[in-house]
Each structure stands twice: as structure tokens, then as C-alpha cells.
Amino acid sequence: MRDIASVGLTSREACGDTVRNVQGCHLAGACPYEILDISAWAEAAHQHFLRHPLGQRLPRKFKINFSGCATDCGQAMFNDVGVIAAARQHDDGSVEAGFRVFVAGGLGANPHPALALEAFTPREE
């Protein structure tokens, strides 16, 4: 285990009631339909929750997923928090890239897609 820890890996969040591995679309950075490469946001979420003490006191496992386009290859719609890159057009014709954030999705005993938290979230937020 020391050797594994020495290269930055851990088994701490592998099971139990914690934030699981933050996941993202397998085509991130290469998808022709991608609005944003979600890799940096997925990595930031991963780093925030990795070994975070709050993560060990959750009532159930907690899953976070990012997708770079509306195709949702990452299946963000079926996770506790799903973030899908989106774009909106302003009145002046300019296009702003950001996200649609979804919550409370799941594939358990009663599968259900996530609910939209808000219509659009700017990427700076």
C-alpha cells in the first residue's frame, strides 16, 4: 500500500459511503461534438474530494460525472451530480460555453434520470 500511495493512488474512496471516482466522457478532448473539454473540471472535482474528510461521512455513495457534449457519453444524467457542457447564444449573436448541471440521477433499484438544477451555468462558476 505504501508503494501505491507513493505514486498518488489510494483505495480509500473505492467503496463505502463516500465520493466515488469522479468520471468523465472517454472522448474528452477528442470528441467532434465537444463544447468544452471537461477534463480540467473533472480533475478539479477529483482533487477537491480526494481524501476529503467530509467524503467519509456521507449517507451513501456519491457519484459525479462530466460530459463534454449533449450526447452525454459520460452518462452524467444517471449520477448524483452530472455536469454536461452546453452553449447559449446571446442577443448579440455571441456564444457562451458553460454547463448544465443535473442532480439526483441514479441507476439503482428505481432508475431515474437526474433533474436539471438550472438551465445554464457559466463555466466560471
Predicted regions and their residues:
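FAD-binding subdomain of flavoenzyme oxidoreductases
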Residues: 76, 97-105, 113-116
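Internal alpha/beta scaffold segment
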Residues: 107-125
